[in-house]
Amino acid sequence: MTKQNPIADAMSAIKNAGDTGKLAVTVEPASRLFGDMLKVMQEYGYITGFEKIDDGRGGQFQIALSGGINKCGVITPRFSVKVEDLESWEIRYLPGKGFGIIILTTSKGVMSHEQARKLGVGGELLGYVF
């Protein structure tokens, strides 16, 4: 059976593993987009590391959790946002100003809403972590 939204399934697996106190989780399939999202999460300390494992079927990510994730999820549909509108989405998905990140894909790559604001670029919303 195919997965309808592999990124949503992976974010849910990360949240569930964190809620149960696990220090590692394996998610599949491994995609380049989700790998870029994991890099952003690692930059902000939400995960300690990850490794892509090629199993010949679609790959897997072995993710080491830091225990700092309260909630994470995807934003569907992937809304296009301008840099001026990022604050309204921040209010909608994050519990407080400066607490957590919204991950978005831009013409300059996958980054947090803070980095996008500094660079002055908009993009499509992918998910949130806090």
Curated annotation (Swiss-Prot):
One of its GO terms (cellular component) is ribonucleoprotein complex. GO terms for molecular function: rRNA binding; structural constituent of ribosome. It comes from the Archaea. The keyword RNA-binding applies. The keyword Magnesium does not apply. Signal peptide: none annotated. One of its GO terms (biological process) is translation. InterPro entries: Ribosomal_uS8, Ribosomal_uS8_CS, Ribosomal_uS8_sf. Keywords: Ribonucleoprotein, Ribosomal protein, RNA-binding, rRNA-binding. Belongs to the universal ribosomal protein uS8 family. Part of the 30S ribosomal subunit. One of the primary rRNA binding proteins, it binds directly to 16S rRNA central domain where it helps coordinate assembly of the platform of the 30S subunit. This is Small ribosomal subunit protein uS8.
